[in-house]
């Protein structure tokens, strides 16, 4: 498998500005460049532009495909991290992207979470219709024996925390501080000579997280839309997912027969994110967040601080807590 390309990801229609708007709304990234037509027209690119984090939204599995190859019997998968390289070209409405997917490597380690655990990584190479290389995402998945995770109980089942009205108000005030920072920078430039190692960066607060917020994130990934993707077809059972989790997620044949089974929200390996009882069947304490969204938060945080005249060139993040 390693180093050999697998079926690429391709959307069926060109991207639309509303795809970008839906994405930043789901990721709580209130940058006017990506949703306000008039503001964007006055900026560097003269039109609405996708955030750098958007590339993962055009994949058919938020980057996990090349990091989940080969069979590990009776296993499950969670995201472990993403490393990104960006090469300059931006994504606009009307673009058509393709993701070239190549498995990269793997290592098996002993973990307190699930005993022997496979950390597998794969590259997602995003190109536009002109062949411009936009970005590379090296995604790492954590593949483990489901029964081990449940038996070892590293993450005990818990209920959602309860927030007071004052706590929620304080969070909203803190969230607005980052938004206000972006407004104040506007179309301005953050010059290299004006920053130093050790400068204190602004705080960005995201949350509180809930099943509602996770569902909003999930629906911003274009591959979750019925019929929107050229699906290569994956045999989840052949990769080792347990029978109750394998399902028909991203199954192109089932999508034409009964798409309710295929979009990943209600059935299949991804449903543990939204349904606590299924989360606990794979060793999670309750409904939990999407790794690819965590990666987007990192990229959006850095890009929002840098402003439209800056860009993220390289980022490497590990997802330590779902």
Protein language model regions, located:
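Active-site beta-strand->loop segment that positions catalytic residues and contacts the acyl thioester
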Residues: 80-96, 105-114, 142-144, 314-322
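A generic structural micro-feature
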Residues: 76, 114-118
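A structural microfeature
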Residues: 135-137, 202
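A short beta-strand signature
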Residues: 118-129
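Residue-level signal for glycine
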Residues: 131-133
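Hot-dog-fold acyl-thioester-processing enzymes
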Residues: 1-81, 148-309
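Short, charged beta-turn/beta-strand-edge "cap" motif at the junction between a beta-strand
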Residues: 102-110, 207-210
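A generic structural signal for residues embedded in beta-strands
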Residues: 99-101, 203
């Amino acid at each position: 498998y390693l180093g050999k390309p697998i079926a690429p990801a391709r959307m069926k229609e060109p991207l639309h500005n509303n795809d970008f708007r839906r994405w930043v709304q789901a990721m709580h990234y209130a940058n006017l460049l990506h949703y306000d037509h008039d503001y964007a027209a006055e900026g560097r690119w003269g039109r609405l532009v996708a955030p750098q984090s958007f590339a993962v939204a055009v994949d058919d599995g938020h980057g996990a495909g090349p990091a989940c190859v080969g069979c590990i019997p009776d296993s499950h998968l969670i995201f472990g991290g993403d490393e990104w390289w960006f090469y300059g070209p931006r994504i606009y409405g009307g673009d058509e992207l393709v993701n070239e997917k190549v498995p990269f490597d793997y290592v098996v380690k002993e973990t307190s979470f699930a005993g022997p655990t496979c950390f597998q990584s794969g590259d997602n190479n995003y190109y536009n219709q002109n062949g411009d290389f936009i970005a590379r995402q090296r995604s790492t998945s954590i593949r483990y024996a489901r029964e081990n995770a449940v038996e070892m109980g590293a993450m005990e089942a818990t209920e959602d925390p309860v927030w007071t009205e004052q706590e929620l108000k304080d969070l909203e005030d803190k969230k607005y501080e980052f938004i206000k920072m972006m407004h104040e920078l506007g179309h301005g430039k953050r010059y290299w000579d004006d920053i130093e190692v050790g400068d204190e960066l602004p705080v960005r607060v995201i949350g509180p997280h809930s099943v509602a917020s996770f569902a909003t994130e999930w629906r911003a990934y274009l591959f979750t839309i019925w019929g929107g993707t050229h699906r290569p077809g994956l045999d989840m059972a052949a990769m080792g997912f347990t029978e109750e989790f394998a399902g028909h997620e991203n199954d192109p044949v089932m999508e034409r027969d009964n798409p309710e089974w295929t979009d990943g929200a209600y059935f299949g390996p991804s449903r543990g994110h939204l349904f606590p009882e299924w989360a606990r069947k794979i060793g999670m304490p309750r409904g939990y967040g999407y790794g690819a969204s965590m990666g987007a938060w990192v990229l959006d945080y850095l890009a929002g601080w840098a402003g439209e005249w800056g860009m993220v060139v390289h980022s490497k993040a590990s997802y330590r807590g779902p």
